[in-house]
Amino acid sequence: MAFTYIIKADTYIRETTVNANVDTTLILPAIKRVQRNIILPILGTALYNDLISEIVSDPDLSSNVPYQTLVNNYLTPTMVEFVNAELPPDMTFKFTNKNIVKKNSENSTSIDLQELRNIIQRATYRGQLEGEKVIKYLIANCNTLFPLYRTPGTTIDTVFPRQTMFSTGMNLGYERRIGFGYQIDPPYWKF
């Protein structure tokens, strides 16, 4: 079975500053990764599978206005930003049978690794902001328009919808910075 894309490469090119001469075979794997790794956890298994089946039967979703609104107003901006984060390494580096090489051009200058990281971080943050809008929209409309959002499934491979796009680190211990090392303090409740 062929993979069904929520957005097309042409949509991505139209929505961004990516040059129109970029080969779509470079863009499609990034869209696929974003769809599987970002959009599926946002929507949950049931809603994602239902959306994909609707796209297969009606590619422009004209018969399903709630899904059309979800895709056009919420998922497309989210996917565009996350593809912006996924695409630069794919376009900068090429895997060959002997090595990983950095692509270059005769009349342009490549960016350095720190600039590449900055571009990826900015696009990821913008994608998280857009993803947060998707989640809030789905939560606000889960009782009326998207009941599958609340019931993602019961099988072992079910992906439950995310409740937020942002995550923070976890403090795993009591440590205090001393000089160049760390000193582990005992927990305060032990005497």
Locate the predicted segments by residue:
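Conserved short "hinge" loops at termini or chain/domain junctions
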Residues: M1-T76, D90-F191
